[in-house]
Amino acid sequence: MKSWSTPAPPTVPSRPDRLRLHDTATGRTRHPGNDGRRASLYVCGITPYDATHLGHASTYVAFDLLHRYWRAAGLEVAYVQNVTDVDDPLLERAEATGVDWRALAEEQTDLFRADMAALEVLAPDHYVGATEAVGLVVDAVETMLAAGRAYRVPGGDGEPEGDVYFDVRSAQSATDWRLGQVSAMDLDEMAAVFPERGGDPDRPGKRDPLDPLLWRVHREGEPAWDGRSLGSGRPGWHIECSVISRAHLPAPFTVQGGGSDLRFPHHEFSAAHATAVDGLPLAHTYAHTGMVALDGEKMSKSLGNLELVSRLRARGVEPVAVRAAILAHHYRSDWEWSEQVLTDAQARVTRWRAALDGPHAAAGVAVLDAVHAALSDDLDAPRALEALDAWAAGTLPGLVETAADPVPVVDVVAALLGLRLR
């Protein structure tokens, strides 16, 4: 599947700060990418309908900061993102609107690509649809069945014979993975959110209510692929990310990213499936973004309370202002989108642009030091923007000493923050 195009970031001098990133799984600070010359990143992609709302955009802009930070440090970065281009919510939306599910997925994925390019999100090296990874899924599920890490559920109660589920208990007894080690949730928390996030705890024949689906055998009217010994059907949700990441990244890779609503079950079981197949952890560090609200509630496809990047662009809103509005909030915080947030961001962009014609436009070292230090501290973008405010006001420390520095501020801001002011 094709990705999108974004200009290469300007080159800026490296800095000695070491990245500190919060790891959801342990609750501790990690230093990903500080121990070598390579880093790898997997960010879970969209299910292509209602693209691209501000919750999506906030997540991809956040991990774009990490990508840019590593690249500015001189690391060779491998970045992979998936597209869940076949899944129940997509099929339900297609049926409700009378659109072919493939046409809906293609249209919304194209829209997502355009939005990401407009927001200056650096493109992944591999952009992979779930439908492109079916063969890899079949390989993995057959391996788990043979090892006793998965099982077939009998038919009945209107369900056909042969759906394959992951055996949580067997996996825990035979591998180093333990339920909750990625999500840092207890059983009560997991049980509460599982049915809200695609789980089916009451499915007859399951060995444990939390066992997730690996392979859904064909139902009338649903798309299906050749599953060899599994029978005709389609992948479950979590397994797609397990196999796509394994196909394109080291095992384990450096950082798994996504929204906080993916902690469980998605990231928990993506990690479990990968370990059940080859015995290796999925990732070293798990990082999650906060939720974006609108009108007092989490922005959600199911609720329909969405602000779309494409809608803002159609209104004539500058994408750089949308990106600045997102960066004004720490990536791990929950926050609320509003017109005032956008107005404030546009005003900041206007001030920064005016300062590019002022006496400190070449004071790149002072700005670089401040922005890099902020991003080194758990990608603290709000602090980085405050440094830009201080630069524009002429109050950032070091401006006098570095006023003749050859590093343009405009390059620093574009390279590290993805804000193209010119």
UniProtKB/Swiss-Prot annotation:
Keyword terms of this UniProt record? ATP-binding, Ligase, Metal-binding, Nucleotide-binding, Zinc
GO cellular component: a single term: cytosol
* Comp. bias regions, Basic and acidic residues: 15-25
According to the record, the signal peptide region is none
Gene3D superfamilies to which the protein is assigned, alphabetical: Anticodon-binding domain of a subclass of class I aminoacyl-tRNA synthetases, HUPs
> What Enzyme Commission number does this protein have?
6.3.1.13
What cofactors does this protein use?
Answer: Zn(2+)
Coordinates of motif 'ERGGDP' region in the sequence? Answer: 196-201
- The UniProt annotation places Zn(2+) binding at C44, C241, H266
Question: Into which EC class is this enzyme placed?
Answer: ligase
- A Pfam cross-reference name: tRNA-synt_1e
GO molecular function ontology, one term from the record:
ATP binding
The UniProt family comment states:
Belongs to the class-I aminoacyl-tRNA synthetase family. MshC subfamily.
Fetch the HAMAP family from UniProt.
Answer: MshC
Q: What does this protein do?
A: Catalyzes the ATP-dependent condensation of GlcN-Ins and L-cysteine to form L-Cys-GlcN-Ins.
- What is the protein's name according to its record? L-cysteine:1D-myo-inositol 2-amino-2-deoxy-alpha-D-glucopyranoside ligase
Classification lineage:
Bacteria, Bacillati, Actinomycetota, Actinomycetes, Micrococcales
